[in-house]
Amino acid sequence: MNFAEVLLERKLLLIGSFVLTSGKVSPYYLDLRPLPNYPEFYDIVNQAIKKAKDIPHDIIVGIATGGVPLSAFIACNLKEPMGYIRIEKKGHGTNRTLELDVKGKRVLLVDDVATTGVSIEKATLEILNGGGKVSDALVIIDRQEGASQRLEKLGVKLHSLFKISEILDELLKSDKLKDNEKKSILDYLVKNVEK
């Protein structure tokens, strides 16, 4: 079973009509937060470790909540420091968004999915405010809806294990989707996915 089929089988990729954070209506939704519950996550971790080894950094920071499990596994395997960042303040306790000292450190940001790049952008700006440097971000899936271009303006390169076009191409070739689902997804890709 390829990763596209795993996503569908494990209900991490849902087909239907979903309103995204950006307000766009999408014919598919990715929810990778449950991925660590499945054995296929370890294949993803191994791919991410290989990518992370090639990216210069001093510390790994996971973006809550989706990026935290992956960043923890990468950091433990590479025996490197790790922390996490919240995009929104909790409103209680210390009210911090950044749960580590990044001053003077090169930070590798990790998240599960990138769509428009707003979450990674906010995390980058928070790290810069904390005195850290961000030149790279690593995600499992890039939805290819502008994240790489947004981050490029900040000097951040987006690395992904998979691009949504590759995943959906696999599913479109298979018999896993109904004809109307294929049409809806193809129409969405033509209008929204960066080339």
UniProtKB/Swiss-Prot annotation:
**Residues the record lists as binding 5-phospho-alpha-D-ribose 1-diphosphate:** 86, 90, 92, 111-119
Residue sites binding orotate per the record:
115, 143
Q: Name one Pfam family in it.
A: Pribosyltran
Q: What is one GO biological process annotated to this record?
A: pyrimidine nucleobase biosynthetic process
Per UniProt, the keywords (alphabetical) are: Glycosyltransferase, Magnesium, Pyrimidine biosynthesis, Transferase
Spell out the reaction equation it catalyses: orotidine 5'-phosphate + diphosphate = orotate + 5-phospho-alpha-D-ribose 1-diphosphate
Q: Please, which domain of life does this record's source organism belong to?
A: Archaea
Cofactors, names only: Mg(2+)
UniProt-recorded Gene Ontology molecular function terms: magnesium ion binding; orotate phosphoribosyltransferase activity
- According to the UniProt entry, what is the EC number of this protein? 2.4.2.10
Q: Which InterPro entries match?
A: OPRT, Or_phspho_trans_dom, PRibTrfase_dom, PRTase-like
Q: Does Magnesium count among this protein's keywords?
A: yes
Glycosyltransferase among keywords? yes
Which family, according to UniProt? Belongs to the purine/pyrimidine phosphoribosyltransferase family. PyrE subfamily.
SUBUNIT field = Homodimer.
Its biological function?
Answer: Catalyzes the transfer of a ribosyl phosphate group from 5-phosphoribose 1-diphosphate to orotate, leading to the formation of orotidine monophosphate (OMP).
The name of this protein is: Orotate phosphoribosyltransferase
Q: Which organism is it from?
A: Saccharolobus solfataricus (strain ATCC 35092 / DSM 1617 / JCM 11322 / P2)
In the UniProt record, the gene name given for this protein reads pyrE
